[in-house]
């Protein structure tokens, strides 16, 4: 058993194992899992959060990519009837397969920083079956998720996540809470998918396209960055000033631009 616990964090998996008991308890309090709920933990590592999540009485599925950690997790939790272990890549996982009709999934993870953004976008595709998500992320990423218009952090990640979810930056975590310590600060974020988006786009894919095009050259004005998609007249028809830069627009303005694009021939 001691050999199993000597697993070294792997750089290629972006592993930094959480060990600070105070931080672990604070995360568990924020999640507040309850009996009968369906939980999914992405990247359980050595099980720092897993034990507390199971202690809530919830049913817990975990996804772990590192096959060398599987024996440790089976040894610690394999006899628990409410525990299911999946060895694989969360970026390719069908999260909807874990829930029955009408059920909602609560997602938890100390996400590897090198895949956090693509994984969040993958999870947003399954937003209808997700109740909420609690993630440990690089602090800089959480600040981008929770950003407001007008600042340098406001961009594609902020807009697309805030289109789908309410974002709450809960608290920060220093490097000393991990082994090995990362070179950056971390933070806990809560993402709660909306039942209905506050600013519904006719086609969310077109919204993503508009946002991506706008921020490809974020220092230029909209009349220039959106030229491949929308004319100046189209931008003005969406009640947006074409002389503004993309970081000056709020989510509602981007949705109006996407809905204007949806009206053009070829997008209806």
From Swiss-Prot:
S-adenosyl-L-methionine binds at residues 16, 18, 43, 64, 89, 110. Its EC number is 2.1.1.182. It is found in: Cytoplasm. The gene is rsmA. This is Ribosomal RNA small subunit methyltransferase A. InterPro entries: KsgA/Erm, rRNA_Ade_diMease-like_C, rRNA_Ade_Mease_Trfase_CS, rRNA_Ade_methylase_Trfase_N, rRNA_adenine_dimethylase, SAM-dependent_MTases_sf. PANTHER family: DIMETHYLADENOSINE TRANSFERASE, DIMETHYLADENOSINE TRANSFERASE-RELATED. Keywords: Cytoplasm, Methyltransferase, RNA-binding, rRNA processing, S-adenosyl-L-methionine, Transferase.
